[in-house]
């Protein structure tokens, strides 16, 4: 029953007060079970059918799918339930207490992106869900801030095929239809230690890595020359050498050297294609020094993403907002949801607030976000 639903600000307050931090470090990582239970109960009160899905390979994490309405197609509204860890020394407020001050709502997850679920629930007060002609789905995922395991698993296992989807990441209500991907690798060279007084008795891993880096930088130049997408501010795939470590003493031949690097591919570039390009670039080193070079993933890769610019979803949202869709360099769950249906990234709050101390969402987004959610539900589920 709608009258059982708390007021908007109380929903928001309860979401922020329920910790759901995702972290690669086990000591910081938290289950999102309590938050999923909170959301599930509210959507059940609104008449939705709710499914809770354990996400394999995680530390007690869950997805939630709330659905209402019959038939094929419909609209999917999606978001992640987790937040990044917080630096207690840099926050001047309690991260888990929603605080309103000077036109801003402060708290961990206010913008990125627990707040989106408060907007959805609040908008549904004015929607007669018994009259939907197409289904409405609400997806809440786990571990977006680390591995994106929730969205990956949902996309791999669901039979759902909505007409379109909107992911409510903070875009300042500017619709995003494309972003780059992200691939990070560790390049490891195994040499052979020895005393520096006799170089011939060892294999210096730093020298081999120097050779490998030359080929990697050549790949970087080739990516810049071969691939182009004018809409991006950096209109080509980027390759960055981010961290290197090797050796332990100036008088010892270095036995091991490790380089961490990333590539941010354009939409349309496949992960297999990128892996092939990297392996081809490093092939001369591997052939010259068999068995000494390995390439391993640092994190699960994220492909680039693009919603067709002429899709009905793009046209409808651009008309409703009076704004053209954009492309961005950061990553979201959109590549995985896009495998189910055309997807836009669009939500309240600024991406500049994501992962920041004293995170906030400006209250000026409340009314237009509520109106937008109501309008897209009416357009895609009532017509």
Swiss-Prot record:
<keyword id="KW-0028">Amino-acid biosynthesis</keyword>
<feature type="binding site">
    <location>
        <position position="80"/>
    </location>
    <ligand>
        <name>Zn(2+) 1</name>
    </ligand>
</feature>
<feature type="binding site">
    <location>
        <position position="112"/>
    </location>
    <ligand>
        <name>Zn(2+) 1</name>
    </ligand>
</feature>
<feature type="active site">
    <location>
        <position position="144"/>
    </location>
</feature>
<keyword id="KW-0862">Zinc</keyword>
<comment type="pathway">
    <text>Amino-acid biosynthesis; L-arginine biosynthesis; L-ornithine from N(2)-acetyl-L-ornithine (linear): step 1/1.</text>
</comment>
<keyword id="KW-0479">Metal-binding</keyword>
<keyword id="KW-0170">Cobalt</keyword>
<feature type="binding site">
    <location>
        <position position="355"/>
    </location>
    <ligand>
        <name>Zn(2+) 2</name>
    </ligand>
</feature>
<dbReference type="GO" id="GO:0006526">
    <property type="term" value="P:L-arginine biosynthetic process"/>
</dbReference>
<dbReference type="GO" id="GO:0005737">
    <property type="term" value="C:cytoplasm"/>
</dbReference>
<comment type="similarity">
    <text>Belongs to the peptidase M20A family. ArgE subfamily.</text>
</comment>
<dbReference type="GO" id="GO:0008270">
    <property type="term" value="F:zinc ion binding"/>
</dbReference>
<dbReference type="Pfam" id="PF01546">
    <property type="entry name" value="Peptidase_M20"/>
</dbReference>
<protein>
    <recommendedName>
        <fullName>Acetylornithine deacetylase</fullName>
        <ecNumber>3.5.1.16</ecNumber>
    </recommendedName>
</protein>
<feature type="active site">
    <location>
        <position position="82"/>
    </location>
</feature>
<dbReference type="InterPro" id="IPR011650">
    <property type="entry name" value="Peptidase_M20_dimer"/>
</dbReference>
<comment type="function">
    <text>Catalyzes the hydrolysis of the amide bond of N(2)-acetylated L-amino acids. Cleaves the acetyl group from N-acetyl-L-ornithine to form L-ornithine, an intermediate in L-arginine biosynthesis pathway, and a branchpoint in the synthesis of polyamines.</text>
</comment>
<feature type="binding site">
    <location>
        <position position="112"/>
    </location>
    <ligand>
        <name>Zn(2+) 2</name>
    </ligand>
</feature>
<keyword id="KW-0378">Hydrolase</keyword>
<dbReference type="InterPro" id="IPR050072">
    <property type="entry name" value="Peptidase_M20A"/>
</dbReference>
<dbReference type="InterPro" id="IPR036264">
    <property type="entry name" value="Bact_exopeptidase_dim_dom"/>
</dbReference>
<dbReference type="GO" id="GO:0050897">
    <property type="term" value="F:cobalt ion binding"/>
</dbReference>
<dbReference type="InterPro" id="IPR002933">
    <property type="entry name" value="Peptidase_M20"/>
</dbReference>
<feature type="binding site">
    <location>
        <position position="169"/>
    </location>
    <ligand>
        <name>Zn(2+) 1</name>
    </ligand>
</feature>
<dbReference type="InterPro" id="IPR001261">
    <property type="entry name" value="ArgE/DapE_CS"/>
</dbReference>
<keyword id="KW-0963">Cytoplasm</keyword>
<feature type="binding site">
    <location>
        <position position="145"/>
    </location>
    <ligand>
        <name>Zn(2+) 2</name>
    </ligand>
</feature>
<dbReference type="GO" id="GO:0008777">
    <property type="term" value="F:acetylornithine deacetylase activity"/>
</dbReference>
<dbReference type="Pfam" id="PF07687">
    <property type="entry name" value="M20_dimer"/>
</dbReference>
<keyword id="KW-0055">Arginine biosynthesis</keyword>
<dbReference type="InterPro" id="IPR010169">
    <property type="entry name" value="AcOrn-deacetyl"/>
</dbReference>
<comment type="subunit">
    <text>Homodimer.</text>
</comment>
């Amino acid at each position: 029953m709608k009258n059982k639903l708390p007021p908007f600000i109380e929903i928001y307050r309860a979401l922020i007060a329920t910790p759901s931090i995702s972290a690669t470090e086990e000591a910081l990582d938290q289950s999102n079970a309590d938050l999923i239970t909170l959301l599930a109960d509210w959507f059940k009160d609104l008449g939705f059918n709710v499914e809770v899905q354990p996400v394999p390979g995680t530390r007690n994490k869950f997805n939630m799918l709330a659905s209402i309405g019959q038939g094929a197609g419909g609209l999917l509204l999606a978001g992640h339930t987790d937040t990044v860890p917080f630096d207690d020394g840099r926050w001047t407020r309690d991260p888990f207490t929603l605080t309103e001050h000077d036109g801003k709502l402060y708290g961990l997850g206010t913008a990125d992106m627990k707040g989106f679920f408060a907007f959805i629930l609040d908008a549904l007060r004015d929607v007669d869900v018994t009259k939907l002609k197409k289904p409405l789905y609400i997806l809440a995922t786990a571990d977006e801030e680390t591995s994106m395991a929730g969205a990956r698993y949902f996309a791999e296992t669901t039979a759902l095929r909505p007409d379109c989807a909107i992911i409510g990441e903070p875009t300042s209500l500017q619709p995003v239809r494309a972003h780059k991907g992200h691939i990070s690798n560790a390049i490891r060279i195994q040499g052979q230690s020895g005393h520096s007084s006799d170089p011939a008795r060892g294999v210096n891993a730093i020298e081999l890595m120097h050779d490998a880096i030359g080929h990697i930088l050549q790949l970087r130049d080739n990516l810049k020359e071969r691939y182009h997408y004018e809409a991006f501010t950096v209109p080509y795939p980027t390759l960055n050498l981010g961290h290197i470590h090797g050796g332990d003493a100036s008088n010892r031949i270095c036995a091991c050297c490790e380089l961490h690097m990333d590539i941010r591919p354009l939409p349309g570039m496949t992960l297999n294609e990128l892996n092939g390009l990297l392996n081809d670039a490093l092939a001369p080193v591997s052939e010259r020094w068999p068995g000494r070079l390995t390439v391993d993933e640092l994190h699960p890769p994220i492909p680039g993403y693009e919603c067709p610019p002429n899709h009905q979803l793009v046209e409808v949202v651009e008309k409703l907002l009076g704004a053209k869709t954009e492309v961005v360099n950061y990553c979201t769950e959109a590549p995985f949801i896009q495998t189910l249906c055309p997807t836009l990234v669009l939500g309240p709050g600024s991406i500049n607030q994501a992962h920041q101390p004293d995170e906030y969402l400006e209250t000026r987004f409340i009314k237009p976000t509520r109106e937008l959610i109501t309008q897209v539900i009416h357009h895609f589920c009532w017509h």
